[in-house]
Every structure is written in structure tokens, then in C-alpha cells.
Amino acid sequence: MSRLSLSQLVLLSIEEQRLALDEINQQLEQKTAIERVIWALEHLPNQFVLSSSFGIQAAVCLHLLTRQYPDIPVILTDTGYLFPETYQFIDELTSSLQLNLKVYRAEISSSWQEARYGKLWLQGIEGIERYNQINKVAPMEKALKELQAKTWFAGLRRQQSKSREHLPVLSIAKGIFKLLPIVDWDNKQIYQYLKQHNLPYHPLWEQGYLSVGDTHTTRKWQEGMSEEETRFFGLKRECGLHE
């Protein structure tokens, strides 16, 4: 089977594109995570990248991908507001997994943003979305362009939130192929993989955090809360990168 061509797919009608991807996804649903990665490396365009927020379970996808493609560029969008433990976790995994880390940031610093706009994350859903556009979406778009990405791997999982429960393994996002190798994994599989390969959870896992982003929009999980409610004051789940 030849490599999938995005240029050929975009010539198809929307319905034909959907049908083509549906057929492929039916096959990918039957594969294991590692088989999906191997399939993608063999059949998708070969400017590969992996994005990571270095969140609670980030070590899984970082290990899974780099064992098959050691030099894959790993994109981090750094807002400047990550937890100190997150920066330490980034350093730890970059060293232990020998990551080819590529860090992208907003064009203006976090302090300058606050001087210009105030604390956007306290300005309701519109403020949060503007903050995400400046600090997450725009840097990611720059990364994908500069790295000439044709295939984008990410560690999203259906179990993480209602907004993710119908995600396909393979899709087209931001004009490139996007593959989610562990999309159907549950928390038990995550735990087993980390244990099997002697990989760490994010340090804040032990303190009761289920999901970790910026210090100002991340809450520790409490009884009765959903995972979605631990981020962005429960107003939204996604930071804009995967919407």
C-alpha cells in the first residue's frame, strides 16, 4: 500500500473523504497502539511530529513513539504558566527518553500579555479562548508550519472527556493527517504501560490532579468532580489545539 496522499484526498468531495477515512479507521480500530504507530510510519506522509503537553500520562505516548521513531520532533507549546513540577517533568523525560524537544511560545511574553490584556483567563469563555489562541493555537500552527509537518501524532483518549469520546484514530486536522494511537485506551491500560516500562506519572498525580495545564486554570480533583471540571473552571475542556 502506497503512502496516503493528502493532496489526493482533498480533491475528493467531503463525503468521499469521510468514506475514505472511515474505511481506514475501521482497520485501525482493530490494531494495537504500537501497530497503529507502525502503520502510520509506513503509510502516512513522512514529516512526522508528536505534540505533548507533558501532562499526567504524557510518558506513554512519548515512549511509544520514540521507540519507533527516536528523532521525531516533540512539540511543546509553553505558555509560561506551567507548574514548576511540569517543567521538571519535561526536563526529566527529555533526558530519560532523549527527546527531540521543540518548544514554541507566544510572540509576546506572559507578563506583556497581562499588561496589554489583563488576566484573560478571568475574563469568561471569550477571554479563555483568546488566551488559548495566543498561547496554544498560534504557537502550534507556527510549529507545524516550520517543521513542515505532514503527519501529527497526539495522545488524546476517548475516556478523557465527553468532547473526546467519539474521536477517530485517524483524521485530517489543520490540513495534515492526525493520528491518535492510544485513543481507545482506558486508565488501567495507561497504568499498565507505565508500570511495564518503568515510566513516571506527572509528579502532581500523587497530589490528586487528574489533568494538568496552566497553574491558573487547573484545579485539583475533588470528590464528585468530572475530569472536565478540573480545567478552565469547568467552562470548557479543550485548549484549542484539538478542537
Swiss-Prot record:
Pathway: Sulfur metabolism; hydrogen sulfide biosynthesis; sulfite from sulfate: step 3/3. Its EC number is 1.8.4.8. It is an enzyme of class 1 (oxidoreductase). InterPro entries: PAPS/APS_Rdtase, PAPS_reduct_dom, PAPS_reductase_CysH, Rossmann-like_a/b/a_fold. GO terms for cellular component: cytoplasm. GO terms for molecular function: phosphoadenylyl-sulfate reductase (thioredoxin) activity. It is found in: Cytoplasm. It comes from the Bacteria. It catalyses: [thioredoxin]-disulfide + sulfite + adenosine 3',5'-bisphosphate + 2 H(+) = [thioredoxin]-dithiol + 3'-phosphoadenylyl sulfate. Keywords: Cytoplasm, Oxidoreductase. The active site is at 239 (nucleophile). One of its GO terms (biological process) is sulfate assimilation, phosphoadenylyl sulfate reduction by phosphoadenylyl-sulfate reductase (thioredoxin). Catalyzes the formation of sulfite from phosphoadenosine 5'-phosphosulfate (PAPS) using thioredoxin as an electron donor. Belongs to the PAPS reductase family. CysH subfamily. This is Phosphoadenosine 5'-phosphosulfate reductase.
